[in-house]
């Protein structure tokens, strides 16, 4: 199985929305300099989605002479661009931001009071699953159930074979919790189709995101989001979620997340919340849809 994470999905979208004739004029390398060879006959673009602190970026970006190798640097968020600008003094005159896109805007689920409240978490396990499972132990409302699709398989068979064992303990913990269903890996198309069946996406991140495809998928589906303000999440999610303040004290962050889930469950049926989610979906269709034409 080949990798099909956010980087691969965004490349698929780019190939869908940009003509082959135009794409043939550029050489795009995603995130890791040199992963795709430089082409002297094309514009060479580094499409940077990784965080500034990744070990495989340090040698290239700390050497300013090497910054000349690419004609353009494209970043997936203003947060990410600002980090590279500030830390590595990248060539700002050859940099720009193109945010990740989303193109699935299904009919939004309208929650009815008294029905089960379904939560989804479909991020890779090192990004905060440990905090979320601890948070679910704090949730008091018996009507709340969390489905966990967390897995390493999204990054391909080789990565999964080498890494999945490191998180077996978390998966086992998830299977034992009464208000959690551990489902594991499902293809992106499955997650996308199932998203409108959920009421909340919960993500207490401990991984500095440069953007967040999982959050975008939930927000664009009109799903209520509970997350924190770590990394670029506050840019991707704007003013739509309930934000828990990021803390290195994971126990406290888990308790705060659990409390936020219970509070959100108490107002999910209210008219103001349904209006909020409707406007949320419109926002992402307006600003993150790559089908938008030039103005």
Give the positions of each predicted feature.
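Conserved donor-binding/catalytic core segment of Leloir-type glycosyltransferases
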Residues: 112-128, 133-138, 146-147
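A charged, aromatic-enriched C-terminal amphipathic alpha-helix characteristic of glycosyltransferases
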Residues: 4-9, 248-252, 269-295
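Nucleotide-activated donor-binding/catalytic signature segment of Leloir-type glycosyltransferases, i.e.
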Residues: 160-186
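N-terminal pre-catalytic "stem/leader" segment of glycosyltransferase-like enzymes
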Residues: 1-38
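Carbohydrate-associated surface elements
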Residues: 79, 101
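Short hydrophobic beta-strand element within catalytic cores of glycosyltransferases
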Residues: 224-227, 234
